[in-house]
From Swiss-Prot:
Mg(2+) binds at residues 9, 58. It catalyses: apo-[ACP] + CoA = holo-[ACP] + adenosine 3',5'-bisphosphate + H(+). It comes from Salmonella typhimurium (strain LT2 / SGSC1412 / ATCC 700720). Its cofactor is Mg(2+). This is Holo-[acyl-carrier-protein] synthase. Transfers the 4'-phosphopantetheine moiety from coenzyme A to a Ser of acyl-carrier-protein. GO terms for biological process: fatty acid biosynthetic process.
Length: 126
């Protein structure tokens, strides 16, 4: 097994809150998968939820070495929690195609948040 990519991102939660205040649900619609959207709609802290998902997806795009472009979209990366609560990634569409092309066998995700920031790191492994 070899490390194929590493990405980290930090998000200022107030920045996400400001975007939501200005443009409503548009950012959430662009960033979240259908499953994440269903959670976001009823979440007790939707801004924090969105900020954490955004951080993971930015970190994943950096780990892939592409950023969000060339057919990749935020909603092709889905963040979910396993039975122990650990954050995991599920891929769709072009993100899945790219992972298969690169030979990604494992994706490791870590996520942290404090009052003002959400931070995520993603490691891609063969």
């Amino acid at each position: 097994m070899a490390i194929l990519g590493l990405g980290t991102d930090i998000v200022e939660i107030a920045r996400i809150e400001a975007v939501i205040s200005r443009s409503g649900e548009r950012l959430a619609r662009r960033v979240l998968s259908d499953n994440e959207w269903a959670i976001w709609e009823t979440h007790q802290q939707p801004v924090r939820f969105l900020a954490k998902r955004f951080a993971v997806k930015e970190a994943a795009a950096k780990a892939f070495g592409t950023g969000i472009r060339n057919g990749l979209a935020f909603n092709q990366f889905e963040v979910f929690n396993d039975e122990l609560g650990k954050p995991r990634l599920r891929l769709w569409g072009e993100a899945l195609t790219l992972a298969e092309k690169l030979g990604v066998a494992h994706m490791h995700v870590t996520l942290a948040d404090e009052r003002h920031y959400a931070c995520a790191t993603v490691i891609l492994e063969s």
